[in-house]
């Protein structure tokens, strides 16, 4: 079933993919489909598939990968909307670091606000400070 769906993704038959996804219950299968959608540039559809994943950790991981794809495509608002759905702090940290990489410091701070772990927050803040110092040094 998954290989059939991946073939449909490669053929660009996304509406068919979303219909077939309704029949799939396994988180691992949903993850593979979502990751394939991300890889092929269908991020909005990947979010729909990811939201069907029942394991919170796995769902957050896939949503993080979509958020990073959005950031790489310059769709910061969509990435920030996904941040609201993600609870796993290490996934939030990776999103913040990606934002810092493209000099979106305010957005990275907004992500950091959602994190309870002091160590992770400090890591993000230090990364922002170092990035700003690097900019000043140029």
Curated annotation (Swiss-Prot):
Q: Which InterPro entries match?
A: TPR-like_helical_dom_sf
Provide the protein name. Uncharacterized protein MJ0659
Origin species, per record, is: Methanocaldococcus jannaschii (strain ATCC 43067 / DSM 2661 / JAL-1 / JCM 10045 / NBRC 100440) (Methanococcus jannaschii)
């Amino acid at each position: 079933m998954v290989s059939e769906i991946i073939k449909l993704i490669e053929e660009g038959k996304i509406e068919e993919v979303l219909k077939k996804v309704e029949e799939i219950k396994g988180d691992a299968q949903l993850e593979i489909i979502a990751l394939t959608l991300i890889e092929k540039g269908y991020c909005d559809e990947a979010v729909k598939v990811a939201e069907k994943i029942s394991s919170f950790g796995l769902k957050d991981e896939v949503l993080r990968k979509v958020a990073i794809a959005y950031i790489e495509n310059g769709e910061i608002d969509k990435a920030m909307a996904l941040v609201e759905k993600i609870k796993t702090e290490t996934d939030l940290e990776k999103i913040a670091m990606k934002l810092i990489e493209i000099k979106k410091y305010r957005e990275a701070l907004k992500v950091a606000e959602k994190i309870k772990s002091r160590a992770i927050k400090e890591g993000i803040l230090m990364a922002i400070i170092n990035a700003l110092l690097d900019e000043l040094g140029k």
